[in-house]
């Protein structure tokens, strides 16, 4: 029976994937489920859902990265291994460990929790690696040498295969290669079993992607099966295609891209792929068992490559652009704005249990009270937890608690921002240095960000690789012009010199752009300000890590981007609150809350938490109870016996259930900035709730604890 062949044309309705994107990915690695990239600064990132998560160590010559369990990453680099926890933080290893400095290759199996290493020709299988076994780099890991296993089974093998050249683990099978020969080992929970040897050249060994241990054949990247025979010879069947046991798989052979897939994946995979490759036709062969093979001829002068470690996780590299292939295509574009620094920022929280309380006088600028305190005590006491208490002119405590501390940090941020907006007007050198230290303190200990930090601040801490980001961030309106000029002056500095601006190179040009609205005195004061900031920054345990990160790290950490996320949770004050009233109030409050402008949200944040840009939840406590009364009717008059003193012996004509009348002019609420709580005591009425919001969006700097 002949196999039908279908010639397909590209569907013009399929949206084109934009590939004209500047990409600074230096290298890419994948494991069974994850994708990792390195940037031009050799920083390693985990890529997940359009975000990049940086590892907390700079590593050179990275060869492989993978997760060995749900909480442990392993990176093979510079002939050794580094282990990271789920937060991408490097885990210190014991001195006497299974990790050496002679590791040439690394392979792994997640199910068995093992890592195999090729070291100076010897292969070691290390069982129990990872957090699940609580071992990480422990020296008591079960460590087996495969060369010894060969020797135990056959002394001839040991003398012949004294030095392996390569290895891989596929389908619970470890395959070791040397001199056109492979040794095959089956993996088990805590041991390894030698099976047999066979002849195969290094090129064919590199193509092996799957092993069928029942039928004794390998599947290769060119779909040709390699059958094991009774002799050491391997039979390569070039007349039949054998495919991996997965719904789809890609391979590039000569100038053709082959996509093996089941029928239902055609529409998901092929039309978008044709758009990426800019091809208009493909040839599809219908195979038995509902399988299809689609072939696309790659355009001339194009560059394409398939990268994979696991056959279930592949990356297409086409003309310098990267596409993750998992059910569909995800264009991987490295951009500094997509880097997630949350884990790094949390590493600053390395505090002791010592609390340091400072009194702040009410109605006196915070900066005036702290400018000569924090710079002098924080240097040696940066692990303290700083709290503030508000006092009056007599020294009596007016307010205290977390709300006061948030309020003080928020006030300090405002006052520093006001000085930055004036570009250090009325500041001298010493004052500028102290302000830099104060900004560090306010940012790290108070989690405050600033609106008026000048671009020059970030330029001074940037590398040449950051200049594109700086232009996008701070000169976005004329980005294309400035970027093209920068490239021109970078390639031909003489054209810049001839402008007569005193600029000699492309670095001078970027500095010129970033200081265009500063005079020399202001630049010098900013240099002093930066010195003060870095004085404290250099003393942190993570400075050696973050100094290698893109400048977007400092922008992300210090600069307020005009957005903050304030959320609301609700609870009843007591069981006396009616469930229907509570549900209705929550729905009305939440709907109105979502209508608020950024300024109104900021005012509510200030009033309820003490900080304009509080990141977290405020709790709305609903306390309204509908007071029910039973009124008795006597001879046409409605009265309440208990209040009116009417004898209960008299028989009323009827009884009426009623409620107290609520005075809608009285909006009853209480605020605890310490607990970030708003207690509300009004009926579930939209007009009343809107009146409450009208009050809350007027900023009130008096704390309520």
Swiss-Prot record:
It comes from the Viruses. This is Uncharacterized protein R348. It comes from Acanthamoeba polyphaga mimivirus.
């Amino acid at each position: 029976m002949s196999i039908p062949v279908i010639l397909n044309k590209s569907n013009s309705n399929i949206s084109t994937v934009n590939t004209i994107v500047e990409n600074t990915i230096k290298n890419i690695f994948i494991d069974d489920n994850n994708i990792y990239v390195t940037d031009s600064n050799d920083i390693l990132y985990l890529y997940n859902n359009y975000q990049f998560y940086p590892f907390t160590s700079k590593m050179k010559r990275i060869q492989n990265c993978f997760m060995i369990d749900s909480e442990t990453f392993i990176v093979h680099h510079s002939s050794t291994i580094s282990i990271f926890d789920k937060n991408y933080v490097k885990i210190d290893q014991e001195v006497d460990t299974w990790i050496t400095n002679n590791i040439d290759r690394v392979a792994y199996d997640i199910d068995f929790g093992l890592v195999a290493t090729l070291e100076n020709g010897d292969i070691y299988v290390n069982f129990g690696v990872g957090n699940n076994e609580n071992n990480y780099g422990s020296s008591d890991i079960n460590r087996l040498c495969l060369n010894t296993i060969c020797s135990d089974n056959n002394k001839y093998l040991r003398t012949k295969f004294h030095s392996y050249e390569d290895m891989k683990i596929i389908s619970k099978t470890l395959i070791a290669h040397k001199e056109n020969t492979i040794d095959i080992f089956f993996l088990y929970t805590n041991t390894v079993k030698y099976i047999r040897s066979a002849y195969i050249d290094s090129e064919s060994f590199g193509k092996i992607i799957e092993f069928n241990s029942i039928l004794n054949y390998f599947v290769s990247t060119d779909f040709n099966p390699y059958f094991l025979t009774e002799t050491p010879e391997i039979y390569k069947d070039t007349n039949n295609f054998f495919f991996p046991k997965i719904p789809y798989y890609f391979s590039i052979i000569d100038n053709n891209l082959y996509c093996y897939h089941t029928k239902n994946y055609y529409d998901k995979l092929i039309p978008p792929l044709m758009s990426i490759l800019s091809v208009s036709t493909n040839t599809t062969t219908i195979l038995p068992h509902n399988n299809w093979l689609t072939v696309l001829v790659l355009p001339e002068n194009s560059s394409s490559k398939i990268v994979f470690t696991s056959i279930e996780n592949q990356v297409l590299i086409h003309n310098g652009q990267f596409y993750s292939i998992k059910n569909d295509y995800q264009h991987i574009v490295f951009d500094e704005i997509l880097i997630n620094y949350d884990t790094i920022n949390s590493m600053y929280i390395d505090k002791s249990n010592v609390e340091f309380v400072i009194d702040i006088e009410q109605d006196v600028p915070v900066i005036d009270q702290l400018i000569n305190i924090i710079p002098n005590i924080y240097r040696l006491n940066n692990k303290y937890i700083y709290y503030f208490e508000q006092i009056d002119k007599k020294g009596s405590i007016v307010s205290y608690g977390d709300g006061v501390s948030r309020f003080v940090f928020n006030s300090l941020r405002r006052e520093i921002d006001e000085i930055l907006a004036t570009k250090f007007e009325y500041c001298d050198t010493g004052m500028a240095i102290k302000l830099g230290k104060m900004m560090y303190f306010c940012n790290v200990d108070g989690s405050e960000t600033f609106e008026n930090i000048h671009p020059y601040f970030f330029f001074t801490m940037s590398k040449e690789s950051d200049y594109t980001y700086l232009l996008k961030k701070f000169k976005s309106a004329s980005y294309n012009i400035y970027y093209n000029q920068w490239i021109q002056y970078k390639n031909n500095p003489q054209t810049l010199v001839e402008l007569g601006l005193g600029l000699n190179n492309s670095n001078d040009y970027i500095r010129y752009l970033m200081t265009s609205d500063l005079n020399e005195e202001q630049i010098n004061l900013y240099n002093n300000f930066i010195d003060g900031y870095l004085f404290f920054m250099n003393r942190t345990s993570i400075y050696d890590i973050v100094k290698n990160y893109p400048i977007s790290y400092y922008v992300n950490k210090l600069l307020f981007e005009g957005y903050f996320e304030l959320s609301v949770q609700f609870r009843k004050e007591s069981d006396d609150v009616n469930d229907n009233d509570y549900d209705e109030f929550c729905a009305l409050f939440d709907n109105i809350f979502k209508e608020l402008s950024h300024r109104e949200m900021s005012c509510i944040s200030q009033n309820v938490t003490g900080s304009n840009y509080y990141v977290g939840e405020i709790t709305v406590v609903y306390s309204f109870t509908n007071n029910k009364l039973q009124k008795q009717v006597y001879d046409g008059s409605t009265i309440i016996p208990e209040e009116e003193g009417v004898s209960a012996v008299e028989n009323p004509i009827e009884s009426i259930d009623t409620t107290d009348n609520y005075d809608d002019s009285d909006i009853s609420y209480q605020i605890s900035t310490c607990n970030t709580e708003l207690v509300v005591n009004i009926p579930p009425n939209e007009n009343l709730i809107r009146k409450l919001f009208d009050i809350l969006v007027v900023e009130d700097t008096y704390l309520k604890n």
